[in-house]
Design a protein with these regions (language model features):
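An extended, acidic, His-containing surface patch that forms the Zn2+-binding/catalytic region
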Residues: 184-185, 242-319, 330-342, 348, ...
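Polar, glycine-rich mid-to-C-terminal structural blocks
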Residues: 207-210, 214-271
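Active-site metal-coordination/substrate-binding segment of hydrolases
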Residues: 78-148, 439
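Acidic/histidine-rich catalytic neighborhood of metal-dependent amide-processing enzymes
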Residues: 118-193
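Acidic, glycine-rich active-site loops and adjacent beta-strand->loop/helix elements
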Residues: 63, 87-89, 111, 147-156, ...
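Flexible glycine/proline-rich, aromatic-decorated loop/lid segments
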Residues: 189-205, 414
């Protein structure tokens, strides 16, 4: 057992209790009724940053939820690492699928089970505990700043303006983020790219009230049927998105990268088994790993209308609504795609209904050069903690603010995430393995020593 491992072992009970104090706060940014919880979580984070060794930890106002800023400057001439994280979490529904209370963390089978255990309270806590270790042992050679927001899960609508206003405060050499996943517990990997995102709500309105389906069915357009028909046209039989101009700015995956992807250890049968599906689906001509990381995609995130209560009610509904999204790749502009999609849906809408397409949040994709000294330091950190060199992989998720950091602050980001697909982020029974939590702290400590 090395010194870092010994420190973690001796202090783990206190570490976990502090983490649990954050998790118990239901900081759900998507629900206005949790407004007070957002402030409570921000204040708790500021307190924990002070306790970890920050010289300054502030809860700062933004146009939306408060932002936590902390820092420790050891030498104005030294490099500065800006650690970004988010303290907001996804809603926990459907609650009936949870095996435990999502906001009362439990340890079972070597995992922490709770909403935010991974995304992003657990992962951001790794960063803070690594910082704490370095401060307490007099080993911190970099200046470290922290910026924790409370709106990542709703698209970070306030953070860009905050960054514009506080450019000098946020000045740094590199941004470090733990909010991504690895290929597996025994397959450490560093994320070198993220997809972008565009998100919409589609509202279809037909008659002025719900109608009797016997009296009107077959004569009046059903908004749910119409909505489903329009959505079905967005992706063709080859898995390609049919919106005109959608692929104009899509850069083909370089052959060298495609070759590298084929060498990534990936068991498609295990992948299917983990999510309980018999077969996979996607764009023709691309592998699963290419489809879910390097290529755009379209998904219906939610759809509703009509009667959904117990029993039956034979109605022809007045309204139907869907929330849909596209994952985008670097060079696709989410504003441009958002308008293209809205124009397309309106162009295929029949005159039998009224259709509204409401753009919601979005963000650009991001690629991290593996030649960055900070990337190489992160690579060494993983190698020290996991005993093997991490693979460099693109991931399919989106963190819209990452590209904004580069545009506004002029700083590149290293994505040093420790999540696993089996951690069920955004789903019931989110969890985080304690073994990965410990290794994560060790890896981040090594990053700071190497950078």
């Amino acid at each position: 057992m090395n010194e870092i491992q010994k420190y973690i072992s001796e202090n783990e009970s206190k570490m976990l209790e502090d983490l649990f104090s954050l998790i118990r706060i239901p900081s759900i940014s998507a629900k206005p009724e949790h407004h007070d919880d957002m402030l409570a979580c921000a204040e708790r984070w500021a307190q924990l940053l002070f306790e970890a060794g920050a010289d300054e930890a502030l809860v700062m106002p933004s146009k939306g939820n408060p932002i936590v800023f902390g820092q420790k400057i050891v030498d104005p001439a030294a490099k500065t690492v800006l650690v970004y994280a988010h303290y907001d979490v996804m809603p926990a529904e459907p609650l009936e699928l949870w095996k435990s209370n999502p906001f009362e963390p439990e340890i079972c089978d070597g995992h922490i089970w709770a909403r935010g255990a991974d995304d992003d309270k657990g992962q951001s806590f790794i960063q803070v505990k690594a910082f704490e270790y370095l401060v307490k042992h007099g080993m911190l050679k970099n200046n470290v700043k922290f910026i924790f927001e409370g709106e990542e899960e709703i698209g970070s609508p306030s953070l860009e303006a905050f960054c514009e206003e506080h450019k000098e405060l946020l000045k740094a050499d590199i941004i470090l983020v733990s909010d991504t996943s690895m290929l597996g517990a025994d397959l450490p990997s560093l994320t070198t790219g993220l997809r972008g995102l565009a998100y919409w709500e589609i509202e279809v309105t037909g008659p002025n009230r719900d109608l009797h389906s016997g009296h009107f069915g077959g004569a009046v357009a059903n908004p749910i049927n119409v909505l489903c028909g329009m959505i079905a046209k967005v992706v063709d039989a080859d898995g390609r998105i049919t919106v005109p101009g959608f692929y104009d700015d899509v850069e083909e995956v370089p052959q060298a990268e495609r070759d590298m992807i084929t060498h990534i250890p990936f068991d498609e049968e295990k992948y299917k088994a983990a999510i309980s599906v018999k077969e996979l689906s996607g764009e023709k001509g691309y592998s699963t790993l290419e489809r879910n990381s390097c290529r755009p995609s379209f998904d219906v995130c939610g759809i509703w209308g009509g009667y959904t209560g117990e029993g039956s009610k034979t109605v022809l509904p007045s309204k139907a609504t869907a929330k849909v999204s596209c994952r985008l790749v670097p060079h696709q502009d989410h504003h441009k795609i958002s308008q293209m999609f809205a124009d397309y849906i309106l162009s295929i809408a029949p005159d039998t209904v009224q259709v509204k397409v409401i753009p919601m949040h979005g963000g650009q994709g991001y690629v991290c050069p593996i030649s960055l000294p900070a990337y190489q330091a992160a690579e060494k950190g993983f190698e020290k903690a996991f005993g093997k060199k991490p693979l460099a992989v693109r991931r399919g998720g989106s963190i819209p603010i990452i590209s904004t950091f580069e545009q506004v602050l002029g700083i590149k980001t290293v994505l040093m995430g420790f999540g696993l697909e089996s951690n069920a982020i955004h789903s019931p029974n989110e969890n985080f393995p304690l073994d990965i939590f410990r290794k994560g702290i060790e890896a981040v400590v090594e990053f700071h020593l190497r950078y």
